């Protein structure tokens, strides 16, 4: 019952009975909670006389009060809590744990006793000490001494003491990931007294950490071959090599990497072996194992026969700065194929020396890539170029000179030779840093180096598309700075050098060949996709038009660049020197320039800006003169019945390359040339109506048929009225009512003569937007 409830009940029950009932109830309350009130407390005056407070007042010492029914236990604060009565623990619910009774001590109660550390905390500390190599704890030194000593002795000592060791039982990996407290089958030190013979908590934590570390190392180490001296499946197995001491874990860039791998490896199931060893071991070392070792020579054709002859020399390939770390597997399973994941180990960089090779070459460095790490189909022979001449190579009898290309850059450091260029019977000495006795080998599956030595690409994907182009490795044996340097090839003689694709390995041309034209900046008018909508599918280009196709295309404005590079007539080839005037007339269909030539900026196809050309004001043929800004009919096909095109000449100029007389023009579109063709719903054009456009183009003057006239609506109506009068036999008007002005009148050469054929007169009322395919009735 709370204090407020206790206080309110006596007030409600007092009523008219006086003050005796509250006092009696208060007396009963005091019998139950007299412990909570200090004896000798003065009574309050009035009707509260005799009542006492059930809660401690301010500035008064605390006394143990009766515990409440609800309680929250803080396990880490139990040792510093005050003493509790014995009956307090008995009244707690059975589901709550009972706190340990504090031991009586004669010391100062203000100094709290240090609690015992849990096993999980000790396990974590011991594991951190092992991984981080901390020297500040004595348990770490003991663990290192036990690890450095005889493992059998430590196992016997653990077995004698009855403690848990890694040799008795190994917990599962799933238990290891859940928490380090599951490693110990022993109860926690706080749960009960430690039995005799059990290891100390710190000792047990050290053993747990060592077992965890050993299990984590065994996941990354390859499986050992089973001991079998008899023949299995017709093949004899060799006994495993003696154990090597457990390696230390150096720190490189803030990460722990194994410095050496434990156990011997042979076959495809084995992972990367250690970095140290003699030449019989599969992986190289920084120095030769002995000066008296003199391996025998062996041809290249037998390189693939030995199981240990083609080990991957990855320290040589990456200059001692990168290695492949295999993917760790579960204990008891075969190690999977390692991933090509580059790391930075801490093994020393091998200092290589020149090798005595036949033929007096410069420095030869053996580079072998085996099939265990990646499915590579080629083996490389690295030839150092430290002593070679600048911009060349030193010829040697064993390598034909035709298979090598001169190195132009003086900073090049080495060459890679194709396996086809090396004779199969040429012996190679064993390099002092490598374990394999074969410096190079040949592969019949891939003709040439189609893939790089460190690229995870299969042979079937590479194919034989490279054509045996040897590649250049731009690093020497001292080391290489990055993998990006492996992308520079050294092609064969007669082929242009181009950077190789980093994944495919084949050369990719960076610039177009000499036969390919360099892309130029085209104007929007020369885009085939845009022009295809402007021109009808039934229209044909003029026979001599540069903007049309001579292969029977339906649009006259497509493939101009291809037509512009060809002459106007197939029988007359292009020439650089000028031709005589008589032959030029024949080439231009009889049209010759009139007047003095002048330099002028004109529109030229495939040019971003107007170009300066030798220009003329007019051309003439058989007494007919065509000037600039006149409209002409252009041939649209080989037949005379083909409907000609209508264009307005903007410039007449001479081609400086061929001497051909050209013209810049603006096209007029007929109704059938519009997008959608002649549509009565869209407009109701007249018979000779055309639509102006801003479509610029160039063409030869040889395709001009004759001169025509394009009139406005008023001029066309006047022309039709005069033609009707002449048809009816009425005389034409002789005198003008108003004399014409010289400034505003039409020039005489653009005035339509009276005897002009009506088929040569056209009406233009609107402008056609060829880019969007619409008619502009009110152009701006």
Swiss-Prot record:
Disulfide bonds: none annotated. Residues 147-160, 191-201, 216-236 have a biased composition (Basic and acidic residues). It is found in: Nucleus; Chromosome. Residues 624-779 form the BAH domain. GO terms for cellular component: chromatin silencing complex; chromosome; nucleoplasm. GO terms for biological process: heterochromatin formation; negative regulation of DNA-templated transcription. Coiled coil: none annotated. Residues 120-131, 263-273 have a biased composition (Low complexity). InterPro entries: BAH_dom, BAH_domain-containing, BAH_sf. The modification Phosphoserine is found at residues 8, 101, 121, 184, 206. Ubiquitinated in a FBXO11-dependent manner; leading to degradation. Residues 1-62, 78-300, 320-358, 514-589, 731-751 are annotated as: Disordered. The modification Phosphothreonine is found at residue 588. This is Bromo adjacent homology domain-containing 1 protein. The gene is BAHD1.
């Amino acid at each position: 019952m709370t204090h407020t409830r206790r206080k309110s009940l006596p007030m409600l029950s007092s009523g008219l009975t006086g003050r005796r009932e509250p006092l009696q109830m208060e007396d009963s309350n005091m019998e139950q909670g007299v412990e909570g009130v200090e004896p000798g407390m003065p009574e309050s005056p009035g009707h509260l006389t005799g009542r006492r407070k059930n809660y401690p007042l301010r500035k008064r010492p605390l006394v143990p009060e009766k515990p409440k029914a609800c309680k929250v236990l803080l396990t880490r604060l139990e040792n510093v809590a005050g003493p509790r009565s014995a009956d307090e623990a008995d009244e707690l619910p059975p589901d709550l744990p009972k706190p340990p009774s504090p031991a009586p001590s004669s010391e100062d109660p203000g100094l709290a006793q240090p609690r015992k550390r849990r096993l999980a905390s000790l396990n974590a500390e011991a594991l951190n000490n092992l991984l981080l190599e901390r020297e500040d704890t004595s348990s770490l030194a003991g663990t290192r001494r036990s690890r450095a000593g005889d493992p059998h002795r430590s196992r016997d000592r653990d077995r004698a003491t009855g403690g848990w060791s890694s040799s008795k039982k190994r917990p599962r990996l799933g238990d290891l990931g859940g928490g380090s407290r599951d490693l110990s089958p022993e109860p926690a030190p706080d749960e009960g007294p430690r039995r005799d013979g059990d290891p100390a908590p710190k000792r047990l934590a050290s053993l747990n950490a060592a077992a965890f570390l050993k299990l984590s190392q065994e996941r990354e180490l390859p499986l050992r071959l089973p001991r079998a001296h008899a023949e299995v499946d017709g093949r004899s197995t060799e006994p495993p090599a003696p154990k090597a001491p457990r390696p230390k874990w150096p720190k490189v860039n803030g990460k722990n990497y194994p410095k050496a791998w434990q156990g011997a490896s042979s076959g495809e199931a084995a992972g990367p072996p250690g970095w140290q060893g003699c030449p019989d071991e599969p992986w190289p070392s920084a120095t030769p194992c002995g000066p008296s070792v003199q391996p025998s020579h062996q041809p290249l054709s037998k390189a693939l026969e030995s199981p240990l002859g083609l080990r991957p020399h990855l320290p040589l390939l990456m200059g001692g700065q990168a290695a492949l770390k295999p993917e760790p597997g579960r204990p008891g399973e075969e190690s999977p194929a390692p991933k090509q994941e580059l790391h930075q180990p801490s093994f020393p960089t091998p200092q290589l020396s020149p090798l005595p090779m036949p033929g007096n070459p410069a420095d030869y460095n053996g580079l072998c890539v085996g099939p265990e790490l990646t499915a590579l189909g080629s083996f490389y022979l690295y030839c150092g170029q430290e002593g070679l001449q600048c911009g060349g190579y030193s010829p040697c009898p064993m390598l034909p000179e035709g298979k090598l290309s001169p190195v132009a850059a003086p900073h090049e450091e080495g060459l890679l030779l194709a396996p086809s260029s090396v004779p199969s019977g040429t012996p190679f000495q064993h390099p002092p840093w490598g374990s394999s006795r074969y410096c190079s080998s040949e592969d019949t599956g891939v003709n040439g180096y189609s893939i790089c030595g460190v690229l995870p690409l299969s042979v079937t994907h590479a194919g034989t598309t490279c054509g045996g182009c040897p590649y250049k490795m731009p690093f020497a044996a001292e080391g290489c700075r990055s993998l990006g340097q492996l992308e520079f090839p050294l092609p064969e003689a007669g082929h242009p050098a181009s950077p190789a694709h980093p994944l495919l390995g084949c050369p990719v041309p960076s610039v177009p060949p000499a036969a390919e034209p360099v892309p130029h900046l085209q104007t929007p008018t020369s885009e085939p996709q845009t022009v295809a909508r402007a021109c009808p599918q039934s229209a044909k280009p003029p026979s001599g038009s540069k903007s049309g196709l001579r292969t029977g295309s339906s649009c006259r404005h497509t493939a101009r660049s291809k037509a512009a590079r060809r002459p106007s007539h197939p029988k007359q080839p292009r020439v650089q020197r000028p031709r005589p005037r008589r032959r030029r007339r024949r080439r231009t269909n009889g049209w010759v320039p009139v007047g003095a030539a002048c330099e002028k900026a004109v529109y030229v196809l495939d040019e971003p800006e107007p170009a300066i050309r030798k220009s003329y004001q007019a051309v003439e043929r058989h007494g007919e003169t065509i000037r600039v800004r006149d409209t002409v009919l252009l041939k649209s096909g080989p037949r005379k019945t083909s409907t000609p095109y209508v264009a307005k000449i903007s410039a007449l100029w001479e081609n400086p390359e061929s001497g051909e007389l050209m013209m810049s023009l603006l096209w007029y579109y007929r109704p059938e040339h519009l997008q959608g063709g002649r549509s009565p719903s869209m407009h109701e054009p007249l018979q000779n109506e055309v639509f102006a456009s801003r479509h610029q183009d160039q063409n030869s003057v040889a395709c001009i048929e004759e001169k025509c006239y394009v009139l406005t609506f008023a001029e066309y109506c006047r022309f039709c009225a005069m033609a009707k009068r002449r048809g009816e036999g009425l005389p034409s008007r002789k005198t003008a009512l108003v004399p014409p002005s010289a400034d505003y009148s039409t020039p005489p050469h653009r005035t339509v003569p009276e005897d002009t054929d009506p088929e040569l007169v056209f009406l233009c009322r609107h402008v056609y937007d060829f880019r969007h395919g619409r008619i502009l009735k009110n152009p701006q």
